[in-house]
Amino acid sequence: MRGLPGAFLGSFKTSYGYLSQRLYGVLTEEKYDGRLYPSHIPTSTVQKAILAVGSGVAALKNPYRHDMVAVLGETTGHQTLIKLRDRMRNDPEGSTILLERPRIRLSTLDLSNMSALPDGTLGREYLRFLEENRVTPDTRAEVKFVDNEELAYVMQRYREVHDLLHTLLGMPTNMLGEVAVKWFEAAQTGLPMCILGAALGPLRLSVSRLQLLGQSLGLWALRNGGRARCVLSIYYERRWEQTLDELRHELNIEEPPVSLIASIKNSSSKS
């Protein structure tokens, strides 16, 4: 039985690779017009189920397989994406985002202007987060398996604001910080992949970090994720000069206690 997950994962990788290649091949035919957006790969219900199960197993084995986490999110979150889309439609700023479809990429960021902003502003602290953690928004995969163009954008927006949530919540990119953000996202969005990550992420934490999560950090993340304004409805690109304190207040997000932030950063330095 111990060999079953590995065997299944190997079979999934082969099937997933073939399916992706086959579908991409179909998409390159000039006569094919089934794409709803440039990166779209149309799939049947059965194909989505196969992708969901296989990507779920792969993500469980290695939560850092962002490609598998992405596939899992796209193949399991349709109903939740509808609810998130509706929340955005009912928000003036969110509806503007749905209309204008901004993207958060290096090509759309004015890095020189952001670096000149005062400490404590969203733009300066977001850039600092990217630099200190050596991450870039360009690593966020394009949505492929969502069979609705507008919902695909909602999923893409969710991915591209993830690092902004790290900035807003003051969370590092170590496992504890990622789990805390995932708990916030689970309460905020209800996406199945976020709930799964929130449930299984703690299994990879040490006893001391698990204790910190259970006693204070997790409760803080769940409370704030559940009561905050929809984080997808914020036009962050127009708010770089706004201070984090002001934006947190507007979103109804509590800043984590100073002692808690210190504990998390200390945990990160030991990773």
From Swiss-Prot:
The enzyme's E.C. designation: 4.1.1.130
Subcellular localization(s) per the UniProt record: Mitochondrion inner membrane
Pathway named in the protein's UniProt entry: Cofactor biosynthesis; ubiquinone biosynthesis
Cofactor(s) in the UniProt record: Zn(2+)
CC annotations in GO: extrinsic component of mitochondrial inner membrane; mitochondrion
Membrane-related topology note: Peripheral membrane protein
Gene Ontology BP term (one): ubiquinone biosynthetic process
Catalytic activity: a 4-hydroxy-3-methoxy-5-(all-trans-polyprenyl)benzoate + H(+) = a 2-methoxy-6-(all-trans-polyprenyl)phenol + CO2
Miscellaneous field: This protein may be expected to contain an N-terminal transit peptide but none has been predicted.
Protein family (similarity comment): Belongs to the COQ4 family.
The protein's assembly and partners: Component of a multi-subunit COQ enzyme complex, composed of at least coq3, coq4, coq5, coq6, coq7 and coq9.
Full protein name: Ubiquinone biosynthesis protein COQ4 homolog, mitochondrial
Gene name as annotated: coq4
